[in-house]
């Protein structure tokens, strides 16, 4: 499955940029309280609505960091399942669809184990010094599970848009997500890793 990922935070950054949908601009939300840096380009899949009312998050494995606002056509290869203080907070893992260097990456088990551990460790600790923030990491899921999650989030986005909910996310607000959100999509984990926690 190919998707468009809008990058908010380039690889190697501590600044946490977010798309301000109302203003149509990139806003600096905060600098990470810890000394960690994003291990890959980070953004979201367009026209999706996750359980937390935001677009579905995505990581893009890429050799050179891009820039906030860059749109990348990506191939989905897996997903990291996790939760934060607001609930489900899954991260879809992607690679640029037309990069021959990434041609061998087709599913989560194609990503080296140590690289997956680096990504997992980042999400276990990146909010550790922020008051009131909680993270619980769960496991890696395969490409099929990631694609099922994307389809569920696209359906949720379409349903919320049909309800005529205006707002910041392409006509969909976080409040609309509460009405449109359903149960967590299923999906078998592949190459699962141990759970961790941060607060």
Q: Where does each model-flagged region fall?
A:
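Hydrophobic N-terminal alpha-helices or hydrophobic patches in metabolic proteins across all domains
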Residues: 1-187, 191-192, 196-199
């Amino acid at each position: 499955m190919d998707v468009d990922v809008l990058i908010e935070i380039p690889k190697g950054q501590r600044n946490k940029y977010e798309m301000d949908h109302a203003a149509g601009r990139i806003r600096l939300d905060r600098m990470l309280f810890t000394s960690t840096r994003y291990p890959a380009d980070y953004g979201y899949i367009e026209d999706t609505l996750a359980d937390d009312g935001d677009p579905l998050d995505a990581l893009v494995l890429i050799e050179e960091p891009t820039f906030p606002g860059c749109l990348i056509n990506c191939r989905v290869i897996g997903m990291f399942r996790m939760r934060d203080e607001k609930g489900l907070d899954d991260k879809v893992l992607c690679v640029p669809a037309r990069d021959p260097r990434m041609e061998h990456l087709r599913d989560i088990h194609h990503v080296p184990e140590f690289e997956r551990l680096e990504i997992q460790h980042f999400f276990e600790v990146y909010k550790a010094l922020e008051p009131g923030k909680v993270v619980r990491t769960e496991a890696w899921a395969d490409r099929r599970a990631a694609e099922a999650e994307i389809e569920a989030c696209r359906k949720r986005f379409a349903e919320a848009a049909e309800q005529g909910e205006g707002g910041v996310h392409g006509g969909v607000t976080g409040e609309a997500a509460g009405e449109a959100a359903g149960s967590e999509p299923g999906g078998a984990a592949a190459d699962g890793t141990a759970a961790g926690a941060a607060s």
